């Protein structure tokens, strides 16, 4: 079969990324591999397609693999929705009959196209050296990122580093044994090294922060070596590599925390100074977060029943200016998170969760449950409901700081600077400085943590970092991996 269908290229027409360099080309699903790769523009378009394929195939799966099995969810939806199987994640009752995710989260579809990009880019003489190396840096980084998800979720998985092309397909040898997790980790580290080498000294976000970059590779390197150090016996040597990578990112990534926590996720503040790599959503290609239906049908309450509830001021939700949510909520955040996961003064509470109350005839309010309030989308002109055109963060600078704190703590060093940078932003400088004896590391202790099912005081540095990661990364697909790593 000589003609090879490049199916992922159909994504190109959908990828006029806002704020990201893009190339408007018609879909080329009918173009054969032999007739493609004839110009620099075709390499550019294929690279756009790779990022679009990761977004369309796996954005929701990245969340599912990294969060619902943790301690964030598990209550019954207060609105009465049927959970339709997603409760198996929080109850950890997935099995051979209900795996939760099929086909390895569709990652191998994207991997095959990455492998093709690597091969053709290495072979070509159509690209200048800098452009060629940048594409290779992105491709090797993306491949390592995907295999890191596969490793953490499945352990032993099939390794494939060459594209499956029809002209090379041997149908008598389609089966391939899974490789041990140790070999998967070796490949991940090898690809990270290849990505770093290809990027060289180029730390730029050349095509925007919805494309892979050297800062993204350094973030991944820090995370990978912390995992291998703690989970796979790498120990001090791996912690040192992680620390060095994260300090390199800190010094050269041109990053800083946003002044306000809510600004990080604002629809009108995309690709801000804190973002490193995000999955883009935008009006221009009509792609909403998690392909819209996965977000809207899992995380958003129905308008009809919200008419019977109010906020903490007693204002009915349907009378709140700008409140126009409409969906289904199958992932119910545990009720106690609103009460026990954030200290007084922490702005991340209201930037993450919204409390739902029932107002009784005597005017008293009864707390019912929290809803997701980190990603708020936007209301388009002429629409009567919100559209989730928010970018979905994969890596951001607060994550880098807390990973660096973790590496330092594991090496017996003082992580106060990194932890307190995140906390100061969370509380605001004025409140933080006035209450350092209560909220600055290592002072966040006391009765708040008595019988707290989610967090502990600062007496243990690892508990302090894990606590900060919970408060910072709700809904960003990290908690399950964090619990396992710690």
Q: Language-model segments: what does each one mean?
A:
Residues 20-67:
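Membrane-proximal, proline-rich intrinsically disordered regions
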Residues 34, 61-80, 160-163, 200-219, ...:
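Short, surface-exposed recognition loops and adjoining beta-strand edges that mediate ligand/DNA contacts
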Residues 117-121, 150-151, 195, 242, ...:
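Alpha-helical solenoid scaffolds that mediate protein-protein interactions
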Residues 41-42, 47, 51-60, 73, ...:
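Elongated scaffold/linker segments in the mid-to-C-terminal portions of large proteins
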Residues 1-29:
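Bacterial Sec-dependent N-terminal signal peptides
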Residues 40, 44-57, 81-154, 175-186, ...:
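Conserved, well-structured interaction surfaces
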